[in-house]
Amino acid sequence: MSTGPFPSSRREESSVSAPSFRFSQRKMLNLLLERNTSFTQDFPRSPGDKLLDSTNLSILSGGTPKRCLDLSNLSNGEMSASPLITSADFDDTGSLDSSGPQDVQLTEKNHHQDPMKGIPVQLLCSTPNALDHSHRKKDAVRGLSANKENINTNLKTLQWESPRIPRFQNTPGDPLASPLPLLGNGVSMDTEVRSLGSPITAVPKLSKNLNLEDQEEISEEPMEFSLEDHDTKECVLPTVSGKHQDLKYITPDTVAALLSGKFQGLIEKFYIIDCRYPYEYLGGHILGAINLCSQKELHEFFLKKPIVPLDIQKRVIIVFLCEFSSERGPRMCRSLRRKDRALNQYPALYYPELYILKGGYRDFFPEYTELCEPQGYCPMHHQDHQAELLMWRNQSKAQEGERQLSEQIALLMKKGVSLP
């Protein structure tokens, strides 16, 4: 049955328009594919990245065979599905094909790559694209964990992050270089830290448990060495070591030789100063000794009118003693030296040679009783002189307080501080 010219023309138009429709559909599909594979500012991607990309998750999910839809027959209203060819290996372009339950292995040009060798030595900065890329990886990993029942367990090796090449390479001597250990050389952070010597750990710790004797020595050293005089002139009398390192000690034998005139060719005059209290001095003292128990009397005796030797080749020496030559004798000796130093310009002194009788009168009396007058020995704590002992001690403390106050006032005046 003839339908006229119009039906035939319609068939011709449909036959002509069908290829053009398929061509337009393919063109749109190619545009979509080109859009997905267009160049971006992201870092170069590795096969591991493409495996973790969200666009490939559909291939990894489930065990159902995948079909490829043919869109060429859309004009006829038919769609054909063809099975997708799967493979467990990567092709040359780095794309991944699914092979169902087969094991997935990462290979690159037929050789294994050390994951630590590909990590950059130092990364100076990060870009927003790298951060976005890392976020996409995190989403992909969460998607894999959510669908872990349908994924092969051998895919756990894909959690390793592929090496990246930083956009900015560090230069030698760059101040912004990271101090992290060189992972590319296989050096661990612990080894790097241990190789750096710390000055804090190298310092030995001080002992907290000091003996009482050591503490006393430490507290006394500044006072002793501050009063020490480094005289280049040799001493006339032979000296020995004593309790105070800054003072010069002589033995009772030397004092006895001095009294016998053994050193007349070197010494013009000598003075033996007995620093004990008057009741001790009256109980027995060395022949020719002068009793001076206060610093004021000592200064007036020797410094009010200094004793100068007539022969410049000879010297004037002073020997101090008390009962044990432990406290009072050394204190008086230091007082005279301090005052003498203040009245002269260093290193000049009126009395450069001051000595201490080691052991005091207690050691001298038993050995040289004939050189004592009277020939007796009255100790400081004698039962018959307790009241006198208390009186002289109070007087000595008062004089010491006045001396310290006068020294502080003189020091303030020297610094220019006005007193009220």
Curated annotation (Swiss-Prot):
Interacts with MAPK14 and 14-3-3 proteins. When phosphorylated on Ser-126 and/or Thr-127, interacts with PLK1. Interacts with MARK3/C-TAK1. Gene3D superfamilies: Rhodanese-like domain. PANTHER family: M-PHASE INDUCER PHOSPHATASE 3, M-PHASE INDUCER PHOSPHATASE DUAL SPECIFICITY PHOSPHATASE CDC25. Keywords: Acetylation, Cell cycle, Cell division, Hydrolase, Mitosis, Nucleus, Phosphoprotein, Protein phosphatase. The active site is at 322. Belongs to the MPI phosphatase family. Phosphorylated by PLK4. Phosphorylated by PLK1, leading to activate the phosphatase activity. Phosphorylation by PLK3 at Ser-219 promotes nuclear translocation. Ser-226 is a minor phosphorylation site. Phosphorylation by CDK1 occurs at G2 and G2-M transition and leads to increased activity. PROSITE patterns: RHODANESE_3. One of its GO terms (molecular function) is protein tyrosine phosphatase activity. Its EC number is 3.1.3.48. Residues 1-20 are annotated as: Disordered. InterPro entries: MPI_Phosphatase (IPR000751), Rhodanese-like_dom (IPR001763), Rhodanese-like_dom_sf (IPR036873). The gene is CDC25C. It is found in: Nucleus. The modification Phosphoserine is found at residues 20, 38, 54, 58, 61, 126, 198, 219, 226, 418. The modification N-acetylserine is found at residue 2. It comes from Mesocricetus auratus (Golden hamster). This is M-phase inducer phosphatase 3.
